Amino acid sequence: MALPASMRLRGHRCFNRLHRIGRRHHGDWMVLRVMPEEPRLLRPELRRHPTRCCRCALVISSKVSKRAVRRNRLRRLLHQHLRQQLEHRGDLAGRWVLISLRPEASEAEPSQLLEECDSLLSSAGLGQ
């Protein structure tokens, strides 16, 4: 199941800001960036509806897999996992998270990706 709209991070200004100043946590198959939210970078309609959780985004480029089916499966897997991990944690409100998969991620088993995602979330102070 996809992330609800209230948990999604959208817009190139948000992504650029996360890439520039976000705190990085590196794993074998992904990089997690996290930073405090900056509502002024959000679109006006999103600013009016503050979220009770952090906002998340996934970047899965065509370098991970040339096949859109494979990239979409990875995206759905990680969206579902993030939703389960972060949805009911009010203490995480006010943070933005960006997860970028590395090209090697296509060779990893789904369980390995989820395990690494958990360890990166924990190292960023977002895990349980």
UniProtKB/Swiss-Prot annotation:
What chemistry does it catalyse, as a reaction equation? Endonucleolytic cleavage of RNA, removing 5'-extranucleotides from tRNA precursor
What is the annotated quaternary arrangement, including any partners?
Answer: Consists of a catalytic RNA component (M1 or rnpB) and a protein subunit.
Q: Which organism is it from?
A: Parasynechococcus marenigrum (strain WH8102)
Q: Which GO terms describe its molecular function?
A: 3'-tRNA processing endoribonuclease activity; ribonuclease P activity; tRNA binding
What name does the UniProt record give this protein? Ribonuclease P protein component
Q: Which GO terms describe its biological process?
A: tRNA 5'-leader removal
Domain of life, per lineage: Bacteria
Top-level class of the enzyme under EC nomenclature: hydrolase
Q: Name one GO cellular component term.
A: ribonuclease P complex
> What role does this protein play?
RNaseP catalyzes the removal of the 5'-leader sequence from pre-tRNA to produce the mature 5'-terminus. It can also cleave other RNA substrates such as 4.5S RNA. The protein component plays an auxiliary but essential role in vivo by binding to the 5'-leader sequence and broadening the substrate specificity of the ribozyme.
Task: Give the similarity note.
Answer: Belongs to the RnpA family.
What are the UniProt keywords, alphabetically?
Endonuclease, Hydrolase, Nuclease, RNA-binding, tRNA processing
Entry's transmembrane regions: none
* EC number of the protein: 3.1.26.5
